[in-house]
């Protein structure tokens, strides 16, 4: 490492070149001091390469000489003095005068100190940044930079769809953005085509491992059925019950994708459900036919009695008409009851486990919990205040540790509510349509 640099000015009364001056320095200092022969010092690395910068001014040559030195301060000063002893370059008089010995380490330290001051000043001026702002900025950047349009249908997708050997198929653009936010770039959306699967999706599903990732509600099941019937899907992932893919956290996404169900198994499960539904419909139809047959028998009996009494009174056919009306009414009631039961089953299927855990928690406390359509808790109030809470805040579902009353059902219907979960129901004169009661065991 160079410790010092000797800087000297040179002036020669004649037209000389740089190598002439360097040769004169070595030649005229040789033999002056035995231990300070410049050639030997250079060979040992004690001094560096001598640099000369010249300019011509008429018949004169003027310039600067630089000699790097690894010697100590005293020895460097001695070399500097030796330079000044040179008084000729070739046949021309010359003058060399040392103007400065630069301490390289000191200069380096000086630069370090100045730079440290600049860094500290800049650092002091910068304000501390909120981590939430950083995360938001990164998130927004990810959204804007990574979302692409793929295929002739211009489907919302991530940049990894083309290069990855696995794709994740979701329903819409918002689902794609949410998965991109958490680093899943091999995602593509149906683009609103929930009934007819786009050709681009079909083609990708044939070429790659395809994962269908759908919402945890009835709509998600419908999308899944269409995908399984029209595209070559390998695995199925579902959001937690009652939740949509676009609202999931990183942990929920990872959990859903780690619990993949083979598409073949999911098809079997869906077929079983459809078979059970068909059997239930068949059973209801058979019961309705039985009721109808019984009423027809009654109708015939009434008709026979009517013929016998025809001479005594008019309108003998009225009982027949009444019997038919009753049969039709009974059949209609049975169908309505069955339809309501099916709807309740569908709603119960998508109630999160956390709600049932909450039901255990509030048992015996006479409290009520109001939920929105995403099963987020809107409010938790005493059971006696539940009606006013529904009127004020509205609710998709209510978990009620108390008696479910007519007033409660009416207010839920008025506010667009759908479910009431509880253990006891009071005498209800009229149950509003669209509001369903789930009795907990």
From Swiss-Prot:
It is an enzyme of class 2 (transferase). Binds two Mg(2+) per subunit. Residues 299-315 have a biased composition (Basic and acidic residues). Mg(2+) 2 binds at residues 215, 217. The keyword Transcription applies. Residues 299-320 are annotated as: Disordered. Pfam families: Toprim_4. Residues 165-241 form the Toprim domain. InterPro entries: DnaG_primase, Primase_DnaG_arc, TOPRIM_DnaG/twinkle, TOPRIM_dom. It comes from the Archaea. Its cofactor is Mg(2+). One of its GO terms (cellular component) is primosome complex. Mg(2+) 1 binds at residues 171, 215. Forms a ternary complex with MCM helicase and DNA. Component of the archaeal exosome complex. RNA polymerase that catalyzes the synthesis of short RNA molecules used as primers for DNA polymerase during DNA replication. Also part of the exosome, which is a complex involved in RNA degradation. Acts as a poly(A)-binding protein that enhances the interaction between heteromeric, adenine-rich transcripts and the exosome. This is DNA primase DnaG. It comes from Ignicoccus hospitalis (strain KIN4/I / DSM 18386 / JCM 14125). The lineage of its organism: Archaea, Thermoproteota, Thermoprotei, Desulfurococcales, Desulfurococcaceae. The gene is dnaG.
């Amino acid at each position: 490492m160079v410790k010092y640099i000797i800087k000297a000015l040179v002036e020669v009364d004649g037209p000389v070149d740089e190598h002439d001056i360097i040769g004169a320095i070595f030649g005229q200092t040789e033999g002056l001091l035995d231990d300070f022969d410049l050639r030997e010092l250079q060979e040992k690395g004690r001094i560096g390469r001598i640099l000369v910068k010249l300019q011509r001014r008429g018949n004169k040559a003027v310039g600067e000489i630089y000699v790097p030195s690894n010697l100590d301060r005293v020895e460097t000063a001695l070399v500097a003095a030796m330079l000044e002893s040179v008084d000729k370059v070739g046949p021309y008089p010359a003058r060399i005068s040392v103007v400065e010995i630069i301490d390289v380490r000191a200069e380096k330290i000086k630069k370090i100190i100045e730079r440290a001051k600049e860094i500290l000043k800049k650092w002091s001026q910068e304000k501390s940044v909120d981590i939430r702002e950083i995360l938001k900025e990164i998130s927004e950047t990810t959204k804007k930079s990574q979302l692409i349009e793929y295929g002739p249908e211009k489907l919302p997708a991530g940049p990894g769809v083309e290069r990855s050997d696995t794709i994740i198929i979701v329903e819409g653009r918002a689902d794609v953005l949410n998965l991109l936010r958490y680093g899943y770039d091999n995602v593509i959306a149906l683009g609103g085509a929930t009934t007819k699967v786009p050709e681009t999706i079909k083609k990708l599903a044939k070429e790659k491992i395809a994962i269908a990732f759908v919402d945890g509600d009835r709509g998600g099941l419908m999308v899944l059925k269409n995908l399984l019937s029209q595209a070559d899907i390998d695995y199925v992932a579902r959001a937690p019950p009652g939740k949509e893919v676009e609202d999931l956290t990183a942990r929920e996404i990872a959990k859903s994708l780690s619990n993949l169900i083979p598409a073949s198994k999911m098809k079997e499960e869906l077929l079983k459900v459809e078979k059970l539904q068909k059997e239930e419909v068949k059973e209801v139809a058979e019961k309705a036919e039985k009721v109808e047959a019984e009423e027809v028998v009654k109708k015939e009996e009434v008709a026979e009695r009517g013929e016998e009494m025809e001479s005594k009174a008019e309108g003998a056919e009225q009982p027949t008409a009444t019997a038919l009306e009753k049969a039709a009414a009974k059949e209609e009631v049975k169908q309505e009851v069955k339809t309501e039961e099916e709807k309740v089953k569908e709603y119960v299927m998508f109630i999160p486990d956390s709600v049932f855990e909450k039901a255990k928690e509030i048992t015996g406390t006479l409290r009520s919990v109001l939920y929105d359509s995403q099963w987020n808790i809107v409010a938790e109030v005493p059971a006696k205040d539940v009606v006013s809470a529904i009127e004020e805040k509205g609710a998709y579902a209510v978990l009620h540790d108390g008696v479910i009353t007519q007033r409660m059902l009416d207010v839920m219907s008025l506010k667009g509510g759908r479910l009431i979960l509880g253990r006891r129901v009071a005498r209800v004169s009229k149950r509003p349509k669209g509001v369903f009661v789930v009795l907990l065991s």
